[in-house]
C-alpha cells in the first residue's frame, strides 16, 4: 500500500518537511561484506516482469534466496496474509486500490480474500479458492480457531467468516465487534486501523486508535488505552511481547517500541539514528511523493518515507543471527531493511545490519513489499503488491511531482499483479506442516517449546481459545521448568508462553507466579511482573511483599516492568515500592522518560474535566477533536503539537502547531477551508516538499471537531476560552456546511496568500 504516508486529519500546516543531508551513494567495501557484487541501475525500466524474471533482479546476502510461494493469476494486489493452525494461507487483496492515478472506483466492494493451500508441502501454493468476495479493501485479518476475522476499509466493524462444508469458501458470517458511534476518517484509506496482532499477553493490537481487543466466547471486547500507537501499516511483536510499530506519515521506521502502548506513548530521540534513517536502493527511484528533496543527486530515495509491514524474525530455519532482528519494508525504495535490535539498560534502539546496504533490494520497479511475516515453516514471507503506483490517490494529484513521474514512466498501467515470496537459506530442508487445528490440547502444550515463534504463538492462541483446563497442570510444570515430557529441555521461551497461557485461561495461581519471580531468566521474571497486575489491581497484600525484592533485580527490563505495573496503583504498599524504585533509578534515562510519559496519562484522563465550564456540545466537539488528534495527528505534529522529529534528525515532518491558529489569524473560515481542500506553498517563508491533502470527504461534524480542538489547544481561542470568554467563536457543523457551500468545488489546495485575500 504505499507509503501509507500522512496522517489524515492534519491541518493546514501538516506538510511533510525533510531537509536531510544529501549523501553520496556508495557500495560497501568493508571487510566481511556478505553481498555478491552488483551494479547500480541509474536508468531503470518500468516494464512488467514475470515472477521468474523478477527473481533475477534481487540483491540478497550470500546463502539466501527467494522462492515464489504464490503469484498472479492466483493472487492479485495482496496486502496481508494470515495462516490458520493448519498452515492454510489467507490473502487479503485490495483489488480496487489505485487502478489508475486518480483512484477511480477505489470504493467499490469488489475486493476479496483468497484461501491458498500447499497440498504437497513443497513450499509453493497449488490450490486456491475465493474465500470471501465483495469486500471493500480488506485491511486486517487474523485466524482464530476455524474462523477468519476480517476488517474492511471505512469501518471498524470486525466480522468472522467460516467455511463449514470444506469447499474453500466462507458460508457463515457473524459480527464479532460492532461500534456505531465511531466516525471513521474515510478521506484517506491509508490512515485507518491496521494490524490485529495477537500478542503474548493475549490482547490483539492495532494501529492508530487507543484500543486493543480481547477475544473470548466468540467475540472481541475492546479495552481502551490512554493514547494511540503512533503506528500506521502493520504491528508486530518479538519473543517477549514487545510491540513494534512504524509510521510512514511521520517518516519514521520505528515508533512506540519502548513500552507497551497500554502504559502510554513513549518515543526516544535516539531510538532511530540519522544513519539508520538513510536508505540504500540499488536503482534510481524517481517516483517519490515530495519531490527532489527526497532524492540524492543519483535519483535514489535518501531516507525512509514509506516504512510499513514490519516484523521480527522468530523462526528456526534461517541463520540464528537473524532471530530477533527487525525487518521493515520500504516500497518506494524497493527494499526491505534488516536491523539489529539493541537493548541497553532497558532502552531499545535499532541499527542497520549492513553498512550502507539493504538486506533485500530489487531493481524491478514494480517490487512493492508491504508486509513481512515469520511463517509456519520458519522462513520469512514477503507480501509484494507488485504494482506501478504505491502511493494513494491523495498524493497523485495532477501537477504534482509524483504524478508527473507516474505519467512519464507509465506506472498506472502496472496493476492486477501480486507476489508472495519466502526467503530461504541454502541447505535447509522443508519443515513438516502444522496440524494445530486437529490436535488435542495435550499435544498443543508441547509446541510451547517449539523453536519457531509461529508455532509457540499459535499453540498458545489455540489453547486460550479452546479453554481446555485439562492441561493446566502441565502448563504449571512448564512455567516452573519442571515438565519433562517435552522435546528437549524447557526453554525460557516455553516458560513465558506457559505463563501467558495460564493467564489467558484464567488459571494463574500464586505459587506458579511467585516461582516465576525467581526464575533464572530476566524475561521470565519480567513476564511474571507483567502478569501480576491483576493482583496489584486487587491490592493483594502478599503481592507487594513478593514484588519488593525485584526492585533490586539485576535486569533493567524487570525493574522497568515493575515500575510500569505499579504506577497506576493507589495502594500504600505500591506507592512505597514505587518511591523506592524511583529513588534508585533517578538518573536512569528510561525511568525518567517513562515516568514523564505516564504522567501525561493523567492529563489525558482529566482533559474532559478541564472543559467542564463549556456547553455540552462544545465540550464534546473538542473531546472528539482531541481523540482524532491524539490518535492520528500526533504522528507528525507530535504530542502537545510540539512537532515530531523525523527519526535521527532535527527536521520535522510538519510544523509545530503551537501558535499556528494565531498565525493564520485564528480565522475559523480559513482553517475549515484548509481541511476541506488542503494547503500548499510556503508557510512562514518555508516551502515544504508535500502538500496538505484535502479532507473534505469527512463529515461537517468531524471537520468542526478538529478545528475546535486546534483552536482551543493551540490558538488564541485557548486563553480566551479558559478565561471564561464565551464570545470566542466556536465552529459548528453548520458553519462548516456554510463554508463548504460557499467555497464550492475546488480541485487545487489553497495557499496562504490566497487565504489572506479572502
Residue map of PLM features:
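Short inter-helical turns and helix N-cap capping residues of alpha-solenoid HEAT/ARM repeat scaffolds
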Residues: 451-452, 483, 490-491, 520-522, ...
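Amphipathic alpha-helical scaffolding segments comprising HEAT/armadillo-like alpha-solenoid repeats
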Residues: 438-445, 468-484, 506-517, 537-551, ...
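Electrostatic cytochrome c docking/interface patches
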Residues: 605-630, 635, 640-645
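Structural detector for internal amphipathic alpha-helices that build alpha-solenoid repeat scaffolds
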Residues: 431-434, 456-467, 490-507, 512-518, ...
Amino acid at each position: 500500500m504505499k507509503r501509507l504516508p500522512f496522517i489524515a486529519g492534519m491541518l493546514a500546516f501538516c506538510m511533510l518537511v525533510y531537509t536531510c543531508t544529501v549523501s553520496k551513494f556508495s557500495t560497501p567495501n568493508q571487510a566481511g561484506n556478505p553481498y555478491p557484487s552488483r551494479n547500480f541501475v541509474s536508468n531503470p525500466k518500468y516494464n512488467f516482469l514475470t515472477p521468474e524474471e523478477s527473481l533475477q533482479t534481487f540483491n540478497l546476502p550470500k546463502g539466501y534466496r527467494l522462492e515464489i510461494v504464490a503469484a498472479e493469476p492466483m493472487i492479485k494486489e495482496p496486502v496481508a496474509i494470515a495462516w490458520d493452525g493448519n498452515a492454510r494461507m489467507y490473502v487479503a487483496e485490495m483489488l480496487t486500490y489505485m487502478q489508475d492515478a486518480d483512484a477511480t472506483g477505489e470504493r467499490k466492494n469488489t475486493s476479496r480474500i483468497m484461501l491458498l493451500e500447499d497440498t504437497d508441502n513443497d513450499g509453493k501454493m497449488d490450490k486456491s479458492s475465493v474465500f470471501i468476495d465483495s469486500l471493500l479493501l480488506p485491511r486486517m485479518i487474523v485466524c482464530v480457531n476455524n474462523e477468519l476475522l476480517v476488517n474492511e476499509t471505512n469501518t471498524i466493524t470486525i466480522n468472522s467468516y467460516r467455511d463449514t462444508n470444506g469447499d474453500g469458501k466462507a458460508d457463515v458470517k457473524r459480527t464479532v465487534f460492532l461500534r456505531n458511534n465511531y466516525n471513521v476518517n474515510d478521506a484517506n484509506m491509508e490512515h485507518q486501523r491496521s494490524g490485529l496482532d495477537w500478542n503474548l499477553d493475549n490482547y490483539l493490537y492495532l494501529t492508530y486508535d487507543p484500543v486493543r481487543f480481547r477475544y473470548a466466547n466468540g467475540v472481541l471486547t475492546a479495552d481502551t488505552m490512554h493514547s494511540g500507537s503512533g503506528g500506521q501499516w502493520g504491528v508486530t511483536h518479538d519473543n517477549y511481547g514487545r510491540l513494534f510499530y512504524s509510521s510512514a506519515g511521520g517518516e519514521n521506521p520505528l515508533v512506540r517500541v519502548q513500552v507497551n502502548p497500554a502504559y502510554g506513548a513513549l518515543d526516544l530521540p535516539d531510538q532511530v539514528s540519522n544513519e539508520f534513517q538513510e536508505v540504500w536502493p540499488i536503482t534510481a527511484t524517481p517516483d517519490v511523493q515530495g519531490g527532489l528533496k527526497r532524492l540524492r543527486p543519483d535519483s535514489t530515495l535518501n531516507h525512509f518515507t514509506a516504512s510499513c509491514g514490519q516484523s521480527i524474525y522468530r523462526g528456526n530455519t534461517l541463520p540464528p543471527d537473524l532471530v530477533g532482528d527487525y525487518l521493515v519494508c520500504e516500497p518506494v525504495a524497493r527494499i526491505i531493511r534488516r536491523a539489529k535490535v539493541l537493548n541497553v539498560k532497558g532502552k531499545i534502539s535499532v541499527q542497520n545490519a549492513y553498512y550502507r546496504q539493504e538486506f533485500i533490494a530489487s531493481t524491478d520497479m514494480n517490487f512493492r513489499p508491504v508486509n513481512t511475516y515469520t511463517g509456519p515453516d520458519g522462513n520469512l514471507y514477503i507480501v509484494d503488491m507488485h504494482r506501478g503506483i504505491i502511493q494513494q490517490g491523495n498524493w497523485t494529484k495532477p501537477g504534482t511531482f509524483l504524478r508527473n513521474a507516474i505519467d512519464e514512466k507509465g506506472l498506472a498501467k502496472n496493476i492486477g499483479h501480486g507476489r508472495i515470496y519466502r526467503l530461504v537459506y541454502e541447505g535447509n530442508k522443508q519443515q513438516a506442516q502444522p496440524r494445530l487445528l486437529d490436535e488435542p490440547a495435550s499435544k498443543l502444550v508441547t509446541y510451547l517449546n517449539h523453536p519457531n515463534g509461529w508455532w509457540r504463538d499459535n499453540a498458545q492462541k489455540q489453547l486460550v481459545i479452546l479453554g481446555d483446563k485439562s492441561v493446566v497442570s502441565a502448563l504449571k510444570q512448564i512455567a516452573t521448568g519442571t515438565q519433562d515430557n517435552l522435546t528437549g529441555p524447557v526453554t525460557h521461551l516455553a516458560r513465558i508462553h506457559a505463563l501467558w497461557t495460564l493467564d489467558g485461561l484464567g488459571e494463574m495461581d500464586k505459587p506458579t507466579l511467585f516461582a516465576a519471580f525467581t526464575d533464572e531468566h530476566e524475561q521470565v521474571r519480567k513476564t511474571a511482573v507483567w502478569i501480576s497486575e491483576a493482583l496489584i489491581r486487587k491490592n493483594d497484600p502478599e503481592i507487594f511483599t513478593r514484588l519488593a525484592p525485584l526492585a533490586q533485580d539485576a535486569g533493567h527490563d524487570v525493574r522497568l516492568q515493575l515500575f510500569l505495573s505499579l504506577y497506576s496503583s493507589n495502594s500504600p504498599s505500591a506507592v512505597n515500592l514505587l518511591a523506592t524504585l524511583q529513588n534508585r533509578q533517578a538518573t536512569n534515562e528510561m525511568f525518567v522518560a517513562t515516568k514523564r510519559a505516564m504522567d501525561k496519562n493523567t492529563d489525558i484522563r482529566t482533559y474532559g474535566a478541564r472543559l467542564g465550564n463549556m456547553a455540552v456540545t462544545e465540550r464534546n466537539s473538542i473531546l472528539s477533536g482531541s481523540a482524532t488528534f491524539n490518535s492520528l495527528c500526533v504522528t507528525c505534529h507530535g504530542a502537545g503539537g510540539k512537532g515530531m522529529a523525523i527519526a535521527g534528525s532535527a527536521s520535522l515532518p510538519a510544523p509545530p502547531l503551537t501558535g499556528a491558529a494565531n498565525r493564520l489569524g485564528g480565522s475559523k473560515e480559513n482553517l475549515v477551508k484548509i481541511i476541506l481542500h488542503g494547503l500548499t506553498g510556503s508557510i512562514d517563508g518555508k516551502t515544504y516538499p508535500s502538500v496538505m491533502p484535502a479532507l473534505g470527504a469527512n463529515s461537517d461534524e468531524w471537520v468542526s471537531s478538529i478545528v475546535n480542538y486546534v483552536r482551543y489547544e493551540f490558538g488564541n481561542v485557548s486563553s480566551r476560552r479558559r478565561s471564561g470568554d464565551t464570545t470566542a467563536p466556536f465552529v459548528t457543523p453548520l458553519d462548516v456546511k456554510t463554508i463548504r457551500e460557499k467555497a464550492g468545488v475546488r480541485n487545487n489546495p489553497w495557499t496562504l496568500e490566497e487565504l489572506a485575500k479572502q
